[in-house]
Amino acid sequence: MKVLVIGGGIGGLSTTLALRRHGFDVDVVERDPAWGVYGVGIIQPGNALRALDSLGLAEACVESGAAIRGDRTWLADGETQIAAHDWPPLVPHLPPGNGLTRPKLHEILTSSTLASGADVRTGVTFSEIAPSDDHVDVAFTDEERRRYDLVVGADGLYSKVREHLFGPDLKPRYTGQVCWRYNLPRLEGLEEIWMFFGPDGSAGFVPLGQDLMYILTIETPIPEWRATIERDGAAAVYRRRLEPFAGPVAEVRDQITDDDAVVLRPIENIIVPAPWHRGRIVLVGDAAHGATPHCGQGAAQAIEDGIVLAEELARDVPVTEALDAFTARRYERCRAIVEGSEMVGKWEQDHSLPIDPDATRNAVIMTASAPI
């Protein structure tokens, strides 16, 4: 079987590696000529490490990152602790969780993909997809044309493959919050995710390496405020947003000085109705189910998608039957995670809502920890 994967990010490369491990012939196209990655760091919870372990990549991630043992929560004063959880490991020889820079994860995935024998072309994407009952003809922006048995849309939250399949009206929805991120030297004693909750949002730290962490802030902006800022002065804006926080957040606030290193994004999500395929074209990862960051499951679910899709295709059944089985295994799990993560964000915006954020997070964790 010959497969085209559109998108060279976490979901696309995980899918490629899983397919190659089952012996499928895979082409990858990535529209970014530099095949780079944007962002700061990423949380790999236990189920992400479990999935990466099945691809032979978990130990490389752990060696390049920082173990996460659990989470700790305080009020904005930095002194009043309100929660502490130690995470159990899902894989005996791996830590409960891991923090890693996005560039390092990208390096691990790209080098493994190239070593797998997949045909990777960068600076290229599709210009036309013409499906039929037994194949898909694809025209590319470099004027090549190729024929495939299956096309996988792994092109992220703003997926063009999704738009091709389902139309322009099915798109990510802004959930009312924004997220700031910035890399900093790691605080002494940071072995867990530390979060601090204030009246209008939260700030926290995630370990990424022996000497590195990132600070993140999830907040509800004023209605007329947009989740975009000018590069000049971005660090000063972020520092001002952190002024309500005392304790460790206040201690590191003045270290935020590099405008270009500030990452600010609107928090959006999407869940594409089942099934996630039309004929021989299927969506994976954020293209199908982009979650908000409140439960740290976005990348984990994308990796799981690739593993499950490869397993179903390896059963040697008709392609559409395998794709139906893929959606059947993935839809309810991903829906629960997307909706649960959004509920936590809703509670952060309005504490009067009848939502128990701890119970909601626990439900998401239980869903994600279950076998795939």
Model-inferred region functions:
Residues 362-372:
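C-terminal auxiliary extensions adjacent to catalytic cores
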Residues 185-191, 224, 248, 315-316:
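Short helix-loop capping/hinge motifs at secondary-structure junctions, enriched
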Residues 6-21, 25, 29, 152-153, ...:
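Conserved mid-domain beta->alpha element of the FAD-binding
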Residues 1-3, 45-166, 170-183, 222-225, ...:
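Conserved N-terminal helical subregion
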Residues 11, 34, 158:
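Conserved Rossmann-like nucleotide-cofactor binding loop
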Residues 33-51:
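Conserved N-terminal glycine-rich FAD pyrophosphate-binding loop of Rossmann-like flavoproteins
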Residues 182, 192-225, 235, 242-245, ...:
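Active-site substrate-recognition segment that forms the wall
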Residues 228-263:
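Flavin-binding catalytic cores
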